[in-house]
Amino acid sequence: VSDRAAAEPYFAQAVDTDNDNFSARNDFGGYLCQSGRIEEGLAQFNSALRNPYNDALYISQLGAGACYVTVLNWKEAERYFLLALVGRPKLALALYHMAKVAFSQADHLRTRAYLQRFFDTGAESAASLLLAVRNELKLKASDLVLLHANRLRAEFPESSEASDMARLMATAND
């Protein structure tokens, strides 16, 4: 906690020293959002997005979307993640975030589609596989539940997600 608090003056100095430093604004925005200062964080991301020299808009869009996720504002989160995907349709992190947004809205077919696109990029994580298991359970697609569950057990056997999945599967079979 003290390291985080000590970092803030450096972030502030970086954006004050160079107002056009969109990378510093993205970093500061992420720091502020993770600190629960959502409005201030979003202001940093929006400033970075307005910068005509920002050649990595998708980073600012991902950051703003993630900031909205922390306050469960799925509509705004989705808007920013979709903007990131316009410029980079195979951006794995945006695809995964869109799957989480769709799942939170109980849109399980869309969740499946975004996860499939995510996996097609070659990306994979314990969290994404657990989300796939949870989603396919909702769709009652037992073959896909087993496929993702087996991948989770094989690739991430010691993860907390593998433990969560085991409990989830046990209750699903009750």
PLM-predicted stretches and their roles:
Residues 17-18, 51-53, 86-87, 120-122, ...:
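Structural marker of alpha-solenoid helical repeat scaffolds
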Residues 27, 61-63, 97-98, 131, ...:
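Canonical tetratricopeptide repeat
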